[in-house]
Design a protein with these regions (language model features):
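An exposed, glycine/acidic-rich loop-and-rim segment of catalytic or binding clefts
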Residues: 7, 11-360
């Protein structure tokens, strides 16, 4: 008997068969304690490492859509100042003047970005080796990274037990989950500092477009610090919900122009009005979904600070989608800052990035 399938039934059948497949990871050890955890999913391949619980590579066919270095990871990442693909914390972004008050107590942090603290300070978790285990499952692989952030290391209150769970599935979706608990009331604002570039030729990302129901950009003052909690609506400014990076960089709007000229591009927190935003070019669509209140977009505006043969990058070689609380929220919002984590209160956050190829 011959079975006839509609296209819809065939697609459902193929999807069921794909999602029923076991997925596997392979570990490759390099020098300096770096392990590369490689997951192959037919059209796509993704690589993580225990150094900074970071993403190293994400290839669609032969096109690497993130910035990084697999072959020389043992040398590349320890010398790299740009946090490529790293888990950042305990606090992502800048804290102005490296100080904050919590319950009327003033905390002095290490200043590692001029007079400011950035990304948790010089002993941030992007620079450490995480313990990890791998769970190979039907339709996905989980890599569970664990560490403890000590107050003695970064001068924030409280020690934090942290799990960072990277999951990759058959639908080419990469999910990051953060689970944490602190011994004291503290600040906790983790994020991943992956740089994306969806161009097949690795050209600058000016041709990428961002879209969401709302694209409210918080303006920056001196030293890239958010100066006001009143953002600028790019949707209203450009009369578009789908806006190309190039149009933002070259805008004649007085406020946008001043910000772009001052900072060389975007390095701004956004309120996207919901949980999802999209970035696309003519080849790919990248969808990010998050439960965090803000997304910081950084378009890699200055690449001159790394004197190394590894530094092959120019301005706008990539862009970040850092899902987090707005940087410096503790000094902007005081005891209403969403980054405040109570003692022994479980923290959970989830962000996913899904890549798909456009059908031309």
């Amino acid at each position: 008997m011959i079975e006839f399938y509609s296209w819809k039934n065939l697609l459902l059948k193929c999807r069921f068969e794909r999602e029923s497949l076991m997925m596997f990871a392979k570990v490759e050890s390099q020098s300096n304690g770096i392990d590369l955890i490689k997951i192959d999913n037919e059209e796509t391949k993704i690589v993580f490492t225990n150094y900074g619980a970071r993403i190293v590579s994400w290839k669609y066919d032969d096109n690497n859509i993130v910035l990084g270095n697999v072959v020389e990871a043992d040398e590349f990442y320890e010398s790299n100042p740009y946090n490529f693909g790293a888990t950042v914390g305990r606090y992502g972004g800048r804290i102005a003047n490296a100080t904050f008050e919590l319950d009327s107590k003033k905390y002095e942090l290490d200043a590692n970005n001029g007079v400011h603290n950035i990304h948790g300070g010089p002993n941030g978790i992007d620079k450490r080796f995480f313990d990890y285990k791998i769970e190979e499952q039907v339709g996905q692989v989980k890599v569970i990274f664990t560490t403890t952030i000590q107050s003695a290391d970064d001068h924030f209150p409280g020690d934090i037990d942290l799990e960072v769970i990277h999951t990759y599935n058959v639908d080419h979706k990469w999910t990051i989950e953060y689970k944490a608990k602190s011994t004291e009331k503290t600040l906790f604002n983790p994020m991943n500092h992956v740089y994306f570039n969806l161009n097949r030729d690795n050209n600058v990302i000016d041709n990428h477009s961002i879209s969401s129901s709302k694209l409210d950009m918080y303006l920056l003052g001196e030293d890239n610090i958010v100066k006001s909690m009143e953002p600028l609506s790019l949707v209203n400014t450009f009369q578009e919900q789908n806006i190309q990076f190039k149009d933002i960089f070259d805008s004649e709007d007085a406020i946008v122009k001043e910000q772009m000229q001052r900072f060389g591009g975007i390095d701004h927190p956004f309120d996207i009005g919901g949980n999802e935003m999209t970035v696309e070019n003519k080849h790919f669509i990248l969808k990010v979904n998050t439960d965090m209140p803000n997304i910081v977009i950084y378009t890699f505006n200055d690449t001159t600070g790394w004197k190394s043969d590894f530094n092959i990058y120019k301005a706008h070689s990539g862009f970040t989608l850092e899902t987090q609380c707005i940087p410096n929220d503790i000094n902007l919002l005081g005891d209403q800052a969403p980054s405040i984590l109570e003692a022994n209160e479980p923290f959970y956050s989830k962000t996913s990035y899904k890549i798909s190829e456009k059908q031309l």
